[in-house]
């Protein structure tokens, strides 16, 4: 049975190529992260550490490490924050830090408001404007 599994994977080089491409993409975007998230993803992407190894180092459960890595992977490969980065000249500095907090770090409205010293209303208003901008730029680059 094990031989069949190995043979099946050997016949799917496109899956290996897709995984390699995804890891290269993540590697190229590690600089967008900061703090613990950057360390976590560096251990995973650059060092090839397993969830179990990272969990032992951090003193947390393997599940929480896996969950955070999957969240960060999704956010790093999602186009919303990158669209903001590519068009940062059209967004204010405040909008850029709020976009980073929301789309990349995954902070809640309340957490962003506390971190940035503004009201939740102000954060909600800025995020609505950022999302509108993202929709507009998406429709320009990908017209239906």
Predicted regions mapped to residue ranges:
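DNA major-groove recognition helix of helix-turn-helix
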Residues: 45, 69, 76, 102, ...
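DNA-contacting interfaces and partner/effector-binding or oligomerization modules
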Residues: 1-52
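Short alpha-helical "recognition helix" segments of helix-turn-helix
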Residues: 53-58, 111-118
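Short amphipathic alpha helix immediately N-terminal
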Residues: 34-47, 91-107
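Short, Lys/Arg-enriched C-terminal cap helix and immediately downstream tail that follows
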Residues: 74-87, 131-144
């Amino acid at each position: 049975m094990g031989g069949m599994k190995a043979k099946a994977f050997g016949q799917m080089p496109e899956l290996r190529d897709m995984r390699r491409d995804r890891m290269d993409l993540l590697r190229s975007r590690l600089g967008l992260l900061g703090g613990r998230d950057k360390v976590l993803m560096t251990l995973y992407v650059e060092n090839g550490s397993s969830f179990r190894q990272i969990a032992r180092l951090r003193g947390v459960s393997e599940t929480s490490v896996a969950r955070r890595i999957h969240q960060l992977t999704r956010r790093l490969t999602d186009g919303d924050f990158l669209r903001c980065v590519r068009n940062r000249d059209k967004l204010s500095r405040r909008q850029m830090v709020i976009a980073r907090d929301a789309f990349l770090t995954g902070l809640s409205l309340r957490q962003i408001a506390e971190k940035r010293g503004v009201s939740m209303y102000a954060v909600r208003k800025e995020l609505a404007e950022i999302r509108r901008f993202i929709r507009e730029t998406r429709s320009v680059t990908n017209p239906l």
